[in-house]
Every structure is written in structure tokens, then in C-alpha cells.
């Protein structure tokens, strides 16, 4: 099962290449889907709904790391959709706050990748701060819903 997850994440990472012709709304949506898949995998490990797997955890962290480096560029002026993609208008009206949380996300993810968690306790220590940043960002910059 972890091999399938790893292959899926690798394919997702390879599909991240953003070119000038890609629609930023579509790309950011796909990127968040990958981040969400990683969050589910790590969350299930932390809740002990899934056996700890260091390779799967690292794959998820690497997807998050790639997203942390590219995500900010996917919200250019004029790309607000009126909420169709769950991004609140505050992404654009409070860009400084949004960019700060993106920087916090990148810092925490980089630290987690560097830590290379090899057990559940280490994964919890590495992922906890990341999930806190995610929560803050979603509270201020994401429209809640299904």
C-alpha cells in the first residue's frame, strides 16, 4: 500500500511543473489536492489509523516542500474566482499576512524534511507545527465547505 502511495506522490510531484500557460487556479487546486493527500496519510499515521511508514511520511513532506516553494506564485492579481476555488478574497486583500503564513509553512516543512522523522514520535514533532500553520491559513484565507 505504501508503494502505491509513494508512486502516486512521485507522479504528482512530476506533474507540478508550472509553465506560463498553465492556469494558476487549476494548478493551485491540483497542488492543494497533493498537499491534502499527504495530510491524510500523515494524519492517519498520527491517529494510528495507519501503520507508521517513514518513506510515505517523507514523500508527503517532500510534496509539501515543493508546494511551499511554488504556492505563492499561484495567486497572481486577477486570479480571484469569487470563491469557486475556495480561496478567500483576503488572499489578495491581505497579501502580507498570506505571504507570512506561506513563509511559515515553508520554514516548518523544511525543518520537518531535514528532521527525516523515523518514528511516530518524531513525525508528530515535525508535523505538528505544520498542521498549526495550515489551520491558521485555512481560517483566514480559505472558504470552508466540502
Would you name each region that the model predicts?
Residues 1-3, 19-20:
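Domain-scale selection of a single, long terminal region
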Residues 13-19:
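N-terminal signal peptide c-region/cleavage motif recognized by signal peptidases
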Residues 21-146:
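Sequence context surrounding c-type heme c attachment/ligation sites in exported
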